[in-house]
Design a protein with these regions (language model features):
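Terminal substrate-recognition subdomain of acyl/acetyltransferases
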Residues: 196-200, 208, 220-224, 232-338, ...
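Hydrophobic positions on the alpha1 helix immediately C-terminal to the Walker A/P-loop
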Residues: 151, 155, 436
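Conserved RecA-like ASCE ATPase "motif II neighborhood" in helicase/translocase motors
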Residues: 7-39, 189-228
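N-terminal accessory nucleic-acid engagement/regulatory domains that precede
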Residues: 14-105
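Conserved RecA-like ASCE P-loop NTPase motor core of nucleic-acid helicases/translocases
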Residues: 1-4, 138-141, 166-179
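Conserved coupling/interface region of RecA-like P-loop/ASCE motor cores
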Residues: 70-121, 245, 255-298
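Walker A/P-loop nucleotide-binding motif
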Residues: 137-150
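Conserved beta-hairpin
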Residues: 353-372, 379
């Protein structure tokens, strides 16, 4: 049995993955994370029990639990209770159904080496594909608890046993923990786990490469694997629903591209559960509560024309009272965004800074845009945040502009950030996304600026440009799942915003060429030529490099928390001008500066040359090293807090 809190990061429960338990108890007195609930449900064997310890019915949620959704200037009292009431109603329905049930849930038979007959067929199909013609790509998609990973491992074990000569088989996954089930069932075959970022170090191509939980990996990285080893037999497996992620990015982007290739991929699926019975009541209850089956609304074939769609703001009390509308909303979000998670359900229902804008054709929801209101902070609070003092939850746009882009005053502006935007697949390319954005602009006419932060693609950047937005910052690393750098785009709505944000476009024009080169050296720039072109073409003239602007930028980097790559265009010339002072620094600090700033070496080499244990240590060492060089250059303390021009 496992006893755990209902709140906290989902990763806190992931250590139990792979276990099959008689019972899991979630103490939900302080609150209940949908992601933790989803994980817990998947741990319980057929015939077992998931126990939720809830406070008395209709009791107010614990303020400590509500605080997780608080964003300045809101308090716990401003957080909604819609998710909590939905949970109470769902628990009541489950208890009533159980009280009137005539039979207990079926207990599946004991697990056999081949699992279900369906799994045995999939194992044989995997063996056939992975021992067949070179260059074959195989895709295995399954829901949780279907034996996907064990099927992969069993297939690898049998491939080794049947092979006339030794095979080089490699497994990769988001983490070693995520691959343990494959490796366990592959034993005793000599299958090696290699992290995704270490695959480049392989001296020879593997005969077979298995990618488990592929939806958790960047799509460009998956595409690159196919291009790098065209003759290897590759198998991509992923979970399509649940806490592992919806898998929509994998299906909508990677698999769609793979289907256009020659030869097309061999597609397999697993539907029958192994650890519990078909139509298991606990799985059905969790699916319904967490909207795992959510799909966009059904549209009539000869329905109304898209241009007649009605724009409006969704009332969240009415939304939670209408299961059909709530499911349609999440169906839109899940189908359009690979990052949608079960915890987004709580945020959409209860976060006090969110507004949901919608487009409807008749009764059908055909578009949605989630907006977060941010900023409006005091100048003192902004200055402290820019110095790295404290954290700002829920203000992603304001925080990025202040602490990363160097526009400290941006936090004082009232901002409206587009968190998600989605349009029904059946009516895309009909101007509805632009209609949504126009509606947002009209509804939030009192804000200083509109903005959005997203994994950059040429198509979305162009769309935002048509809506009047401009890129003002590009992230310095690839997104964990998109594989693309993030981009910040803003549209000014008041003269004050235009004045405050004016330096950002020329600053990005100055920063981006060197930033991109440094990211490419690290393997973090997966942007295609189209994205690179659309970003570069829209930039303003680069900000001039004067003695004052360089000194201000270096002081901002040294005194804050912004990553080096975004400020390298200023730090490098300043260090070059003061290189004579490096010998006076601590040898390790001087080595880090010489390797990263002057030689532009990748972080891994910087760590090696400076005698540091790894990349994170090298990255942490650079800022204090530059700060020490600033002190040697005898810059005044006041200059370190100035905002760069």
């Amino acid at each position: 049995m496992l006893w755990a809190s209902g709140l906290g990061p989902a990763r806190g429960l992931r250590g139990a993955l792979g276990q099959t338990l008689d019972a899991v108890v979630l103490d939900a007195h302080a609150g209940l994370s949908p992601e933790r609930l989803a994980i817990a449900e998947g741990l319980v064997r057929g015939g077992g029990a998931l126990v939720l310890r809830l406070p008395p019915e209709c009791a107010a949620p614990d303020p400590l639990g509500q605080a997780a959704l608080c964003v300045e200037p809101f308090t716990a009292q401003d957080v909604g209770t819609r998710w909590w009431r939905r949970l109470e109603r769902a628990c009541g329905a489950a208890w009533i159904e159980r009280a009137h049930a005539e039979t207990l849930p079926l207990i599946p038979p004991a697990f056999a080496p081949t699992g279900t007959p369906e799994q045995a067929q999939v194992i044989e199909a995997l063996i056939a594909h992975l021992s067949g013609e070179p260059g074959v790509r195989t895709v295995l998609i399954a829901e949780r608890g279907r034996g996907k990973s064990s099927a992969l491992g069993a297939a690898l074990a049998q491939l080794h046993a049947r092979a006339p000569a030794p095979l080089c088989c490699v497994v990769t996954a988001p983490t070693l923990e995520a691959a343990r089930e494959v490796l366990r069932f592959a034993a005793p075959a000599p299958v090696e786990f290699v992290a995704l970022d270490a695959l480049d170090g392989l001296s020879t191509a593997p005969d077979i490469l298995v990618v488990d939980e592929a939806a958790q990996l960047p799509v460009p990285a998956l595409t690159a694997l196919c291009a790098r080893w065209p003759e290897a037999r590759l198998a991509f497996a992923t979970t399509t629903r649940g806490y592992e992620g919806t898998g929509r990015g994998f299906v909508l982007r990677f698999l769609a591209d793979l289907r256009q290739a020659e030869p097309p991929p061999r597609e397999l699926s697993l539907t029958a559960p192994i650890r519990w019975a078909v139509d298991d009541p606990l799985e059905a209850w969790t699916r319904a509560l967490l909207l795992f089956e959510a799909e966009p609304a059904q549209l009539e074939a000869a329905g109304e024309r898209p241009e007649r769609a009605r724009a409006h703001v969704l009332d969240r009390d009415a939304l939670v009272a209408s299961p059909q509308t709530l499911s349609a909303l999440f169906g839109l979000l899940v189908h359009a965004h690979y990052r949608t998670t079960p915890d987004d359900l709580v945020r959409v229902l209860d976060a006090p800074n969110l507004t949901i804008h919608a487009l409807s054709l008749g009764d059908a929801l055909v578009g949605a845009c989630v907006i977060a209101v941010e900023g409006g902070l005091t100048a003192e609070r902004c200055a402290a945040l820019a110095r790295g003092e404290g954290r700002l939850r829920g203000h992603a746009l304001a925080d990025t502009l202040m602490t990363q882009a160097g526009c400290v005053e941006a936090g004082t502006l009232r901002l409206a950030r587009s968190v998600r935007i989605a349009v029904h697949p059946a009516v895309r390319r009909a101007g509805l996304a632009s209609r949504l954005v126009e509606h947002v602009h009209a509804h939030h006419a009192d804000v200083d600026a509109f903005g959005t932060v997203f994994g950059a693609t040429a198509e979305v950047v162009r769309f935002r440009q048509r809506c009047g937005y401009h890129a003002v910052r590009v992230g310095v690393s690839a997104g964990a799942r998109s594989g693309e750098p993030s981009v910040v785009m803003v549209r000014c709505n008041t003269p004050r915003a235009a004045q405050v944000l004016a330096p950002l476009r020329p600053r990005l024009a100055r920063a981006l060429p060197l930033q991109r080169a440094l990211m490419q050296a690290e393997g973090h720039w997966h942007a295609d030529d189209a994205l690179s072109a659309v970003l570069s073409d829209a930039l303003a003239a680069p900000a001039p490099l004067t003695q004052d602007t360089v000194a201000e930028a270096v002081a901002f980097y040294a005194g804050g928390a912004a990553p080096y790559e975004g400020w390298a265009a200023w730090v490098r010339p300043w260090v070059e001008a003061h290189a004579r002072l490096l010998d006076a620094l601590d040898p390790r600090a001087a080595a880090v500066i010489r390797a990263r700033v002057l030689a532009a070496l990748p972080w891994r080499q910087v760590a090696h040359l400076a005698g540091l244990p790894g990349v994170p240590a090298a990255q942490r060492a650079l800022r204090p090293a530059v700060r020490a060089l600033l002190a040697r250059a005898d810059l005044t303390p006041s200059s370190r807090s100035r905002t760069p021009s």
